[in-house]
């Protein structure tokens, strides 16, 4: 690998700077790069070359982890375009979205109290459908409309849903014990 750093993660994997990307292409580029820069491949190299190989492998892992997850990929794209999602200090959401969150959390608590995995499964199905819809909308906003401020709102909503998904996964684990 050359010592010249790529401009961004998309360039590193030779991918277009877009939200919608072919996961199989990302995976194959990642595996190809890992095969070339993995520290085990550098055992015969000088200390400087080993360190450089480790840096490239670390960069490849970080880039891959960011681009393979829709929420992280959207955040990264917005950052490239100078848009701060302000997730830490801007929790303003449409009232309908917030009411839905409250309703879903209440459903989850009821399912836990009733030890109903079926109710958790139904909630998980609806949550996945909503997340898929948001991801599709993000693709349109980022790739077609290039409406970055509006996309930042969707990123904040998707972050809420991902948190709910983690909580739902924990609820499933709780019922399995």
Swiss-Prot record:
Gene3D superfamilies reported in the protein's UniProt record: DnaJ domain, HscB, C-terminal domain
Domain of life assignment: Bacteria
The keyword Nucleotide-binding appears for this protein: no
GO molecular function: ATPase activator activity; protein-folding chaperone binding
GO biological process, one term: [2Fe-2S] cluster assembly
InterPro entries referenced in this protein's UniProt entry, alphabetically: DnaJ_domain, HscB, HscB_C_sf, HscB_oligo_C, J_dom_sf
Protein name (database record): Co-chaperone protein HscB homolog
Gene: hscB
Quaternary context: Interacts with HscA and stimulates its ATPase activity.
